[in-house]
Amino acid sequence: MEKTLGLEIIEVVEQAAIASARLMGKGLRNEADGVAVKAMRDRMNQIYMRGRIVIGEGERDDAPMLYIGEQVGICTQPNAAQMCSIDELLEIDIAVDPCEGTNLVAEGRQGSMAVLAISEKGGLLGAPDLYMKKLAAPPQAKGKVHIDYPATKNLQIIAECLDRAIEDLVVIVMKRDRHKDLISEIRSTGARVRFIDDGDISAALSAGINGTGVHALMGIGAAPEGVISAAALRCLGSHFQGQLIYDPDVVQTGLLKGTKAEIEEQLKAQGVEQPDKVWEAEELASGKNVLFAACGITDGDFIKGVRFFTGSARTETMVISSQSNTVRFVDTVHILDPAHHASLVI
């Protein structure tokens, strides 16, 4: 999978990032997402693959493109058997977030990326569009921290694993009312809190990569993004756990319809037999071969955003593979207008 699709998925996230970055700082949140979705889908449909969106822009009735269940790739066409090889006809699952952090792009702030993860069929959990409690931590803490532990205990463990004082730790938390108690607990240990308003895939990666200055992600965010984060951190050998949160009183957004009991019954009817299960990264992204790619739209902790020059653009992409146990950073210059070759900046 990596040999046949590795370069292709790089180009998929690059095209989405370039399209969205054109609208950076213009206050056009929905438009920045829309152009990224279209660019990502267009490039996917040029690839010799048989892909199925398992995490995307929503249900079919709510999303015109990259909706859950959509088939993408040349090898989904009726005459695919005549055009595609046996390997290309194998089904793959795809999880996408073409513009992770739409508000960040609209406001010209750091941390937005175009991301996707792929695996063989059944290799990525199709998480319901609910919330998820998440814990991400560096590789040294994998299997030692636990999402059920108090934040105090987890920070003590992380500090010991990294051989540093708790006061040296930085924890990313999404700035939401539901996290008031969590924030107070983190601060009581002496650790520092870094708030984000959006983009917790980027935050999970920052926690899972040594040297970013971030040592944990804690709190509740969107469940689909949790699966994509799990795919990346599983490939990195870092710690990630997630647990569905479906109690409206806990998430405090007003977006969940019905009571906790009603939503629990809906989940069970959809086949989620253990709604309160704690999911490990290896369960959320269980495939034998998992590939993750992220291209910066705006600058982040580990990759730069898109930079535009006369007739060209430069992107930075991170590609992580469970198959080859590699993390690659790809620096690409895109000639957007051949008439301006002389203006190329390296």
UniProtKB/Swiss-Prot annotation:
The enzyme's E.C. designation: 3.1.3.11, 3.1.3.37
- Give the residues the record marks as binding substrate: 100-102, 131, 176-178, 198-200
Domain of life, per UniProt, equals Bacteria
- Does this UniProt record's set of keywords contain Transit peptide? no
Catalytic activity annotation: beta-D-fructose 1,6-bisphosphate + H2O = beta-D-fructose 6-phosphate + phosphate; D-sedoheptulose 1,7-bisphosphate + H2O = D-sedoheptulose 7-phosphate + phosphate
Q: In which pathway does it act?
A: Carbohydrate biosynthesis; Calvin cycle
Show the coiled coil region(s): none
- InterPro entries noted in UniProt: FBPase_class-2/SBPase
| Gene Ontology MF term list | fructose 1,6-bisphosphate 1-phosphatase activity; metal ion binding; sedoheptulose-bisphosphatase activity
Protein task: Catalyzes the hydrolysis of fructose 1,6-bisphosphate (Fru 1,6-P2) and sedoheptulose 1,7-bisphosphate (Sed 1,7-P2) to fructose 6-phosphate and sedoheptulose 7-phosphate, respectively.
Q: How does it assemble?
A: Homotetramer.
What is this protein's record name? D-fructose 1,6-bisphosphatase class 2/sedoheptulose 1,7-bisphosphatase
Q: Which organism is it from?
A: Gloeobacter violaceus (strain ATCC 29082 / PCC 7421)
Q: What is the lineage of its organism?
A: Bacteria, Bacillati, Cyanobacteriota, Cyanophyceae, Gloeobacterales
